[in-house]
Amino acid sequence: MFSHIMIGTNDLDRAKTFYDAALGALGVSPGVFNGNRVFYRTATGVFAVSKPINGEPASIGNGSTMGFAAATPALADAWHAAGLAAGGMACEDPPGVRNG
């Protein structure tokens, strides 16, 4: 169901130290820095820790993202359109492959 989950942090170095240890105990490789984010990739999805893109401090929900997996780009576009039609609001780029 999920392709990725991202949570916010105000201290990326401290978060990386914590998640390297915690996820390492599950056999996950150490996180990889990419700008203001740290990514933990596995065969089944991605967990990431990020400073919020809006520049505000991380708090409950700010800096957090969950990506729903879609079987095709057309389904991802349909999902996005349905969400907007139901009153949702786009907060970042439209659906598509994210580099990083």
Question: What kind of feature is each model-predicted range?
Answer:
Residues 41-78, 84:
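Long, continuous compositionally biased terminal/linker segments
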Residues 7-47:
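Core segments of cupin and vicinal oxygen chelate
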Residues 1-3:
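Extreme N-terminal starter segment of soluble prokaryotic enzymes
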Residues 10-14, 68-100:
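Vicinal oxygen chelate
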Residues 25-27, 54-55, 95-97:
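Intrinsically disordered, low-complexity segments enriched in polar/charged residues with Gly/Pro
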Residues 5-7, 66-67:
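Short, contiguous strand/loop micro-motifs
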Residues 36-38, 51, 93:
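Extracytoplasmic/periplasmic beta-strand context in beta-sandwich domains
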